[in-house]
Amino acid sequence: MMQTKVQNKKRQVAFFILLMLWGEVGSESIQYSVLEETESGTFVANLTKDLGLRVGELASRGARVVFKGNRQHLQFDPQTHDLLLNEKLDREELCGSTELCVLPFQVLLENPLQFFQASLRVRDINDHAPEFPAREMLLKISEITMPGKIFPLKMAHDLDTGSNGLQRYTISSNPHFHVLTRNRSEGRKFPELVLDKPLDREEQPQLRLTLIALDGGSPPRSGTSEIQIQVLDINDNVPEFAEELYEAQVPENNPLGSLVITVSARDLDAGSFGKVSYALFQVDDVNQPFEINAITGEIRLRKALDFEEIQSYDLDVEATDGGGLSGKCSLLVRVLDVNDNAPELTMSFFISPIPENLPEIIVAVFSVSDADSGHNQQVICSIENNLPFLLRPTVENFYTLVTEGALDRESRAEYNITITVTDLGTPRLKTQQSITVQVSDVNDNAPAFTQTSYTLFVRENNSPALHIGSVSATDRDSGINAQVTYSLLPPQDPHLPLASLVSINADNGHLFALRSLDYEALQAFEFRVGATDRGSPALSSEALVRVLVLDANDNSPFVLYPLQNGSAPCTELVPRAAEPGYLVTKVVAVDGDSGQNAWLSYQLLKATELGLFGVWAHNGEVRTARLLSERDAAKHRLVVLVKDNGEPPRSATATLHVLLVDGFSQPYLPLPEAAPAPAQADLLTVYLVVALASVSSLFLFSVLLFVAVRLCRRSRAASVGRCSVPEGPFPEHLVDVNGTGTLSQSYQYKVCLTGGSETNEFKFLKPIMPNFPPQGTEREMEETPTSRNSFPFS
């Protein structure tokens, strides 16, 4: 608020700030002179020399000559740097009767803005002869008039001034009169006829004389008027005015017919000799704005006055009686100025558009004038307060419109500025001129992304050149400064092959996958994109793009256990005494996909005898479904289907061989040599087999040592766990050491591998060694069902 008041105050007093604001304006005015009526194109001066500038500086700085009222009396030649006359000058038209005719002007330079004051004096030549208002004048003079009597005559008018103006009057040779040349207060010369010798009507009733007006030119010019003198009979008294000089003041806007003043004269004679009539000694009957009532002496306005053209009138009023005698007085009418002229604004220099980022740019240079006078002529310039512009006075009623500070095109690209010029008259008159200033763009805004980071989702196995998303940036600038180009920035991870993964359309920010993505190889990656405008210098910004690869069900389940090796199938041993729900084994499988594509379910697809075994759907455990009997076949082949939850689902099968035994103790089940894995077998499977064999061998040795020390009943023991035996008849070396026909003890080891395990580590629990009674039968020998499930593989 305070800042606005200060700015407003500055603008109000702007008119009264003097030339101190512009140090570069010269304090002395350069003066030139030229004779009037000189031909157009005549050399006046060389500006480069007179202004003390370098050669070529005037042309490079756009020199121009500015006169008041926007008239171009002179022209500047940019080639020679000379000032030349632009037109013939008529001093009388330009300055009227003013003797000293001086036309002020300014030389305006740009970059930086600079003013030089100068003036052109138009010198008078003797191109006008004196002229009388009438070719003939009539005088009536009584024969008894005494010598020395003075008779005023109508004056001649010469448009020239100084020595070329009217200088003197002469009269043709005669014995009765001579002429005197008198000076008025304002400098004009008028003639007076002086009687030298008495007249005699009877001898010569009339005379004709020639009045000659001469100027001071070389050679002199002259004008003539005939004087006809009638000699009258005796009339003793001459009309006499109450005052020798009357003065009146008339506002220029007085209506026609209004009374200016009333003059009055008396004549002491009687009868017709005492009757007075009034008349004006008029220089120009056509242009004279006054008229007089011949009877009353009232002088009234018959034509409109204009103070700006003529400020005062000098009139001679004549009073004539009936006998022909006359008296004379002078009337000075001063025209009073009325504020009837609005100020004028002349634009000399205007720039649009202007750059937005530079302070105090000169937008316009203009001059103001008012044809009135006094307070009516004083003016104040102003613009709206809410605009970032200032008015600064320079010289001779010149103003500059400058920016107050740097503009911002993005906030406002155009300003409509109304310049108001108001005079100080009553009532105040004003003139307004509107200009439109365009603000040109400068690249001062970097592109801005709509988001600081983008997250894109791409399903794996996509087709190359797939459009995976877009980034977008906008620039508040305009034109070429707002044209945005997109690019990929170097990745922060040097191992990320970004150039082979994605590309970006430089024009619209569309992102494309260059090749098919594999979720199992690359789940996500991120990179930065840049947006650069085309300004100078170019500005840029960047945004982060995260690409998340969505899993597709492109991997089938893989069975880790039992190993699916055609040359060495896995055989599980199950005692016939097993209860329903007895854990036979567990199918362990993994899926390379993720999410629901990796959710596995298990089901029994085929079995030698349906209803004997079942598979738990969620964990792949194979358990007995009922009690076993002697009638059940000893060998069983199970096919377990492992299926994921993808769409469409993928599956794999695992084949199990189950051998039903009546009972066993210290069996020796040699491990067959595994067939060499095919070249394309998974490396993880190889590691699992090697680790399993190593751990099993170590564990077997420990069990043998433990049994030999504690029981001392066996000389040799074999570990039966997750054993692999070839299909076919039960090995002959597995014998019943107790002679009961069954195995008295069962050493079972369960290896479980969970689907989430990726460490290839195996964990083993201690073997289950049930305590059998010495004389127990097969029925009395119970095996804990959970023992098969107490040996997890993770």
Swiss-Prot record:
Q: What is this protein called?
A: Protocadherin beta-6
* Assembly and oligomerization: Forms homodimers in trans (molecules expressed by two different cells). Forms promiscuous heterodimers in cis (at the plasma membrane of the same cell) with other protocadherins.
GO terms classed as biological process: cell adhesion; cell-cell recognition; homophilic cell adhesion via plasma membrane adhesion molecules; nervous system development
Give the gene name. Answer: PCDHB6
- Species for this entry: Pan troglodytes
Q: Does the keyword Nucleotidyltransferase apply?
A: no
Where are the glycosylation sites?
A: N46, N183, N416, N565
Extract the GO molecular function terms from the UniProt entry: calcium ion binding; identical protein binding
Function of the molecule: Calcium-dependent cell-adhesion protein involved in cells self-recognition and non-self discrimination. Thereby, it is involved in the establishment and maintenance of specific neuronal connections in the brain.
Extract the InterPro entries matched here: Cadherin-like_dom (IPR002126), Cadherin-like_sf (IPR015919), Cadherin_C (IPR032455), Cadherin_CS (IPR020894), Cadherin_N (IPR013164), Protocadherin/Cadherin-CA (IPR050174)
Q: Name the predominant localization.
A: membrane
Q: Return the SUPFAM superfamilies for the record.
A: Cadherin-like
Q: Where in the cell is it found?
A: Cell membrane
Signal peptide boundaries: 1-27
Q: Which residues lie on this side of the membrane: Extracellular?
A: 28-688
UniProt keyword Signal present: yes
Q: What is known of its domains?
A: Cadherin 1 to cadherin 4 domains mediate homophilic trans-interaction, the interaction with an identical protocadherin expressed by a neighboring cell. This is a head-to-tail interaction, the cadherin 1 domain interacting with the cadherin 4 domain and the cadherin 2 domain interacting the cadherin 3 domain of the other protocadherin. The cadherin 6 domain mediates promiscuous interactions with protocadherins on the same cell membrane. Each cadherin domain binds three calcium ions.
